[in-house]
Amino acid sequence: EMPLIEGLIAIGPQLQKEYPGKKLLLIANMDSNVRDIMRREEELRKYYAFAFPSLKIIEDTSDKAKFPLLAAEHGLNVPQTLEIDFSGSLEDELAKLEQVNQPFPWIIKPATSAGYERLKWPGKAKVYTVSNKEEAQTLLANLYQHTHNNPHARRFVLQPRVEGNDSFNLSVTAYVDQNLRVTMLGSAQVLLEDHSPTALGNPVAMITEPYPRLYEQVSSFLKGVGWHGFANFDFKVDSRTGIAYCFEVNPRIGRNSYYNTSAGMNPMRFFVEDVVEGKAIAPQRLGKRVYYSILPKRLVLRYVDKQMGKKIKTLYRLKKNHDPLFYPADFGFSLRGLKRFAYVMIARENHWRKYHRNYPVAKFRQGETRSLDTAALTQP
């Protein structure tokens, strides 16, 4: 069932009457919504204008076993990946472990969420970490047993864990127009992620900066697969080797895409020029450094090293800091404005409690506390 899509189709004629001669733009920032839109593309295009990759590209890139093959073919660096397929015998899949020549720990996770996410058993997780071959064998045997009657949940991938704290994560946002031109590329270093269970992994503090060599990889991949629309890439630099690996690409604009606007490059401009105006806009690459965060500065400083702390303080001093929730026009002298201001300030301060509960400083200090120095990545 796709109630959202059915609703969009049902309301389409009414919206066209309300806005005659106007293009109705359809944007999504959930992968599931993008898939549903492209499954009903022909019906939706009667009323709406949108830009997404084909359904095949979406499905291939969201499959964690297929994506590494596609990435390698088109110049995108990914971790070594081994597919585990339980459609055959368990013994054959366990024998594949001999092919892995990477150090422990290893990560094991479902190739696709479809099918797997509906299963329940004690100890089930979205991602598993194993510290030796015996643990890997035990886990695979357990997964084989619990997915036995579910053919859509029997494929997994095994990868070496890429080491590094939150600051070793990088975000790249791209837009590809209908002529396969990568018109926009923006990026940022993640300093701190959300560690609450319902929002785990979402960046909450970032510094924007260009990564020319990653831009080359991203452009090669997007052109090679025939992408159209927004793409959001997640990279991580291995703290041991300094090599940047791509973990996934989402066929949509990211939740934190406002970091691009903060740095002077509004992603919506590229979308509108392509889909509404049909113009071949000149390609742009992000160049400005700004600090983007929804957290109190003092809280973030607890989770970065001294060098990174100096960068943050310098950007504050230069007034190059942005909080997407802190919009002065929302805080007018009215009851509504005062309520909005109170909500934003309370939400900011509430992060102290959330991090104390979910990611205390003591836990951060148990691992590597060095922040990633991105100087090499910003060079052409």
Model-derived features: where do they sit?
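Conserved N-proximal alpha/beta basic substrate-recognition cap immediately N-terminal to
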Residues: 1-88, 92, 113-118
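Active-site nucleotide/adenylate-binding loops and adjacent lid/helix of ATP-dependent enzymes
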Residues: 60-156, 179, 213-215, 380
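Phosphate-binding site of ATP-dependent enzymes
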Residues: 131-195, 209-216, 237, 244-245
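Flexible, glycine/charged-enriched surface loops at secondary-structure junctions
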Residues: 152-157, 230-233, 281-286
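Glycine-rich phosphate/pyrophosphate-binding beta-alpha loops
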Residues: 192-203, 250-264
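Oxyanion-binding "anion nests"
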Residues: 197-200, 208-233
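Conserved metal-phosphate-binding beta-hairpin within the catalytic cores
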Residues: 222-258
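Peripheral (often C-terminal) accessory segments that flank ATP-dependent C-N-forming ligase machineries
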Residues: 272-380
